Amino acid sequence: MLGKFVYSNPTKLYFGENSLENLPQELACYGKNVMLVYGGGSIKKNGIYENVVKLLRDGGKTVFEDAGVMPNPTLEKLYEGCRIAKENKVDLILAVGGGSVCDYAKAVSVSAYCETDPWEKYYLRMEAVDNKIIPVGCVLTMVGTGSEMNGGSVITNHAAKAKIGRVFGDNVFPRFSILDPTYTFTLPRYQMVAGFFDIMSHILEQYFSGTDDNTSDYLMEGLLRSLIHSSRIAVQSPEDYEARSNIMWIATWALNTLVAKGKSTDWMVHMIGQSIGAYTDATHGMTLAAVSLPYYRHIMPYGLAKFKRFAINVWDVRPEGKTDEQIAQAGLAAMESYMRELGLVLNGRELGVYETMLDGIAQGSFILEGGYKVLTKEEIVEILKETLKA
């Protein structure tokens, strides 16, 4: 295992059924003014909103609501949230929802007291946060992003056709997160499986890099096997607690920075997928699904040993009588079968991607250097063309 690193994660997790009962003891650590952030209103239908608000009122909190956070939070919405937070001098931002809601809460937490344009400072120039940060807590209702235990925050600027993710330091991580697997039971299937693939993609982005014997790779193989097993159960039985709890826990560990330690990481699938999202506003997990197979088939020759290992250790491909390339190809074929089994979108046209967009999407994709192949913009266009053939 190469490299030197420090590992620390400041987020306190409460995991399991009825874990919302721990919210009052966390609320007691913060001041009176709480900004309650949530999405389109599903939490009002399933009773979570009522339960959270009651605990806030019982705790003597003054609640300022910021509803309507969209699946790909926009810059305009961020400015609105900053205004609410600053005008009301909120002491805590409580995000109740999925990854987009938690991402948005973190964006508001660092941006509300920014003296210049936070988009320019924190998302374009990637400057360090040097202003007051409002603490964030999270009540998770949808799995996928891992935002409940990391500093990640993705914001979309439609005017610039840009969707940019910023990974802030541990001072922006949620102070606490509450994870009750039963809150995920009623999620529509499309959103559920998109979240499952978001989890898988987070792991693969960190797995397909490096050539050393790295403990992190063994951890990721175990997470992938558990995810494949449990997701197959969950799509058949959405209220299977064991499966949904396993998936919720995998999602957290996939992106809480642990498995990236000692590794370079890739993230090109996310760069291309986020650029697709900036043009189409498509569901994030589905953009990753559409890009993944063409991308991995493109880079496979440059990381053949790892793709062979992936096939054998994750998909149980039998190596006998096969070349290394055939083994690697069989692994990606098994992954494709699994993706089709779940009903994931593999064709970009289903997401609103058309030939006229490809150059723009490629130009909007940041080029990273942590994987097995540093792409050119022309290669990204070719990968995007393959997504339209699936």
Task: Report the location of each language-model feature.
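ATP/NTP phosphate-donor binding region
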Residues: M1-L92
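A glycine/threonine-rich phosphate-anchoring loop and its flanking beta-alpha core
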Residues: T11, C114-D212, R309
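Active-site segments that bind and position negatively charged phosphate/pyrophosphate groups
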Residues: Q206-A334
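C-terminal charged capping/lid subdomain of soluble metabolic enzymes
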Residues: N171, V314, R318-A390
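Short glycine/serine/threonine-rich phosphate/pyrophosphate-binding segments
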Residues: L20-L23, K44-I48, L75-L78, S100-A105, ...
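Glycine/serine-rich anion-binding loops at beta->alpha junctions
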Residues: V90-K106, T141-S147, Y279
